[in-house]
Amino acid sequence: MIIDCHTHLNNYHDETQHSLTEDLARLQLMMRRHRIDAALVLTSYKIVPGRPSARAVVEATSHLPNINVVAGISWATFDAAQVSELRSLLEARAIKGLKLYPGYEPFYPADPKLTPAYLLAEEFDVPVMIHTGDTYAPNGKVKFAHPLHVDEVAVDFPRVKFLICHLGNPWFRDCMEVVYKNENVYTDISGLTLGQFTDRFEAYMRQQLKEMILWGVNPNKVLYGTDWPLASMESYLDFMEELKLPPRDKALMLFENAAALFKLELQPRRGGLESLLSRW
């Protein structure tokens, strides 16, 4: 099986706006084409045309057991009403986690304003995904997105599981340290490139990921994700193939880690992980 733990249904990167139904159909098509068994859809930190709310995505995907939702949180507008909405979604088991976007918004993860979000994550035992590293938007402020800032909330909220998105790119070693040091911190490999990997960049990223595992980061703390549609599913599967990891590590990264962290109960798509593993 293969789980893509990091996808979006936003289409702000396209010149033409699409409906949520169209974007969802496109995601399903890509999943079938590339034999992806399940995906987590991360909603945005703001609700505008092209960026549907968590509840809208939950309703649109309610009939699709292989697509689950992670609710994006806006630091700028986070208030009691948002806490109530998140609680409602969590009580209904409609979302599998929360997502913060430091860098896209000017805040640090340890901002006390976000304490209610972390307490919700602790109460319902769902992970908090945190954007780190480079921002797709040129007006982002990357000082807020350094992976070292995740260490503070990981220490202050030891019963909450945190996921550092994008390996902290370009601060890979800092990401390694935070994941290695904190039992409750994980990372994903999503969003390392836009579109396709170039040969030189793919070789560089392979080295970074292998170094992370050799450095002491347990493979059961690294999750497979793409950041689709900004990144190519096909390119990412090729990247995984070129890593040439041991079969056990591949299985952990491609499926088992995400299934455990997000508590996913899924039926495998025929020809998913087994087919991919057969390529190596």
Per-segment meaning from a language model:
Residues 1-8, 19-38, 217-223, 232-280:
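Mid-to-C-terminal alpha-helical segments outside catalytic/metal-binding sites
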Residues 6, 31, 57, 98, ...:
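Conserved, mostly hydrophobic/aromatic
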Residues 6-12, 131, 166:
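Histidine-centered divalent metal-coordination motifs
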Residues 9-22, 135-137, 196-198:
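Acidic/histidine-rich helix-loop elements
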Residues 25-48, 66-74, 96-97, 162:
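Divalent metal-dependent hydrolysis catalytic cores, especially in the metallo-beta-lactamase
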Residues 45-46, 75, 102-104, 134-136, ...:
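Active-site-proximal loop/turn and secondary-structure-junction residues that shape catalytic pockets
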Residues 48-144:
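Active-site gating/metal-coordination segments in enzymes
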Residues 93-97, 110-223, 276-279:
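Catalytic pocket-lining loop regions of alpha/beta-barrel enzymes
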